[in-house]
Amino acid sequence: MKNIFTILTLSITVSLVAQTHEITKHNGIKMEVNFIKTANNLVYYTLPQSAEEKSISQFAISQLQEKSKTEVKTISKKITLSGKADYNKVIVLKPSQTEGLQESGIITSFLGKTKGETNQSFLDEAEKRLKQNAALKGSPFIVIVSNKPKKLKAVMYTYK
């Protein structure tokens, strides 16, 4: 009976250890976690000593390493901006996708809507303007708060 209990305990322990992963953030910080899944630009995980599910933006993570296989998976590449011309690299996120990123300020802009301009073309131009302002300030991520004519506003995010 003791042998069966010992074997059962070891098999459960080995399966838990096999699920252990190491997350490496873009700022170099490493976290030991139990990886669950990736969905909607978020990485879901639990801490080894807890069962509470947590999430972090996939853009804050550089690599995910599975400890049992020493397999390394690249989650995202670090975005570096060199000026306003790199506005295409700026990513627009939803507020829920910013976990693990650091808020770096608010940008505002003015953009008048011309007569006959469609709503979609106005929204595209507004997004472009906000991305250019964020790239100029070196922030690779934005969350658009307001895209109304005469009141464009976004929150900028960078790596922690």
Where are these regions (language model features)?
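Bacterial Sec-dependent N-terminal signal peptides
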Residues: 1-22
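Compositionally biased alpha-helical segments
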Residues: 19-141, 145-149, 155-160
